[in-house]
Amino acid sequence: MYCVLMKQESIGFDNRWIRGGKKVNQRERKKRTAKTESAVKTVEKAETVKVEQTKKAVVKAAKAEKVYNTRFEKKLDELRWLYMELYGNSSMFAELCDQMHRFYEERTDVLKKLDSKREADPDWYKKNDMLGMMFYIDNFAGNMKGVESKIDYLEKNNVNYIHLMPFLDTPKGRSDGGYAVADFRKVQENLGTMDELEELTGACHEKGISVCMDFVMNHTSEDHEWAKKARQGDGEYMSRYFFYDNSYIPSLYEKTVPQVFPTTAPGNFTWLPEIGHYVMTTFYPYQWDLNYRNPRVFNEMMYNFLFLANKGIDIIRIDAVPYIWKELNTSCRNLPQVHTIVRMMRLISEIVCPGILLLGEVVMEPEKVVPYFGTVEKPECHMLYNVTTMATTWHTVATRDVSLLKKQLDIVNGLPKDYVFLNYLRCHDDIGWGLDYATLKQEGIEERSHKKYLNDYFQGYTGESNSRGVLYNEDPVTGDARFCGTTASMCGIEKAGFEKDKAAMKRAIQMDVMLHAYMFMQSGIPVLYSGDEIGQVNDYSYKNDPDKVQDSRYIHRGAMHWDLAARADDPKTVEGQLFGQLDKLEKIRKKEKAFMTNADTWTVETWDNSILCIGRYYDGDKIYGLFNFSEYDKTAWINERDGLYKDLITGQEMEAAGVNIPAYGFYWLKKK
């Protein structure tokens, strides 16, 4: 009965009991088949995508390899010739080439793209919007992360190039302000990490800001791994420095090599009693000079250079360039081999990381500075500091006489336009009075007495001075010394603020702004020192710090006062007046094409020793800058009668002839 019923039910209901099961199974099989086919398609699609990605990666790698090979083949012959001339070691050269390729492969796609962009526009850093700012990371914002959080402030300052003062690992109390490096691949722990450096450079690049750092090539800290092994008597590492087991060779060097710090670190060698050897220490006893006669030293330092470049650094400041090659019976300064090394460094960077710029620190007279540009055909440094012009500017402030400054600018303006100087009023270092004393002597001014006058003036010891500051590394025998102080303090802002003298403050601010306006008119790239934009004065707290008290340069290395920076938008404050006027100058400079770095630049006779006139011309635009370095109103007796000019600051129209200029005043006159 059950079977019959089921049969009837199955007949009555389309055989669902018997055939329905088959239908369910068929549907399930179809679903499973569909899922399988879908999964297969997904896998096939993923494999296709993977294959395509692999193909793209292969094509991309091949393209990158082709780019590298093109650069390498173009530079190889000269690089090999220079290397073999200096070292004659083919195996070390082969190693160098292998490592260059490795560092190129490790360079990120973002940096490679930036390299290509800059290769296509080699004058990218010569634009009229290029404005730098230098600062110590801890003083400015505490650490790397802090700097990253202040990028908006940098943009507010119209800055698109920052120089991070030395931040690599150094021993506490023996750092020379960061220039005694113990590890070239480690950031000082209190400042951050290499990863955070890379994050900072990446964040800066997103905002169009280039990043500069110091690369100390001449020496390492005595705490460097090499120095530690050398101190243990390891010959391999001793050969990376200059070691001597008696005083004979050191005494020969001392006959011809000048002392850098005759009072604080006399001599050029330090005795190490634990190993019974002398080691060369041109700067401080804890900074051991590297021996670049050893190709291992050159190679390893280039690897450090490329490592840092791959962290996103755009500008490498080569510290103490003239000192890096040593020869007996010479001054060990500016020797030909130095130029060979810098040229090789330029070639290496153009192969591996052509977006990098080399900035040379050559604190010497102009005729010794200029050769570090190399030649137009075989360039060395992209940029050099305009050190002598900076010192001559402050000489002009103290004497109210622009004659020497005009001559100095004429020398700079007469150089090829490919040569780019970094112009600044103040930096982290002292001011050494390395002026053109041969010219001054023709005016009856003697070097020794004039240096004393300048140091007295800027310390505020002369009646006509409103400056404040201190001496550095004074030599009691010769009376020679260098000077330290911030721009604002040297202009009189510190004194006027202390004395609550409103008239003096107005005059000091006017001088400060005039000097910046003059700096912006020079041929080259202007660089601000952090704090100058708000008129920070000398910081005397260093005298209470046992690690700093012996180094008076810390007077102008004070921490950034963010409470003062908060007043930058208030025109009633000193900070607001300075910031607002500098901001206006910077924006005008960015707008006017006559401020391009490679514009024609020249000086014009004003027939008044207190007034400087600088002319600039580019692509049909002409601007004259007139600057009064005197506390009295003056007249510039220029006679440019080719039509009306417009002052870019006030909008006033006038002829560029017989121009009256107020005390510490200036004009930027553009031909209409």
Predicted regions and their residues:
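Active-site and adjacent substrate-binding regions of carbohydrate-active enzymes
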Residues: Y2, K7-K672
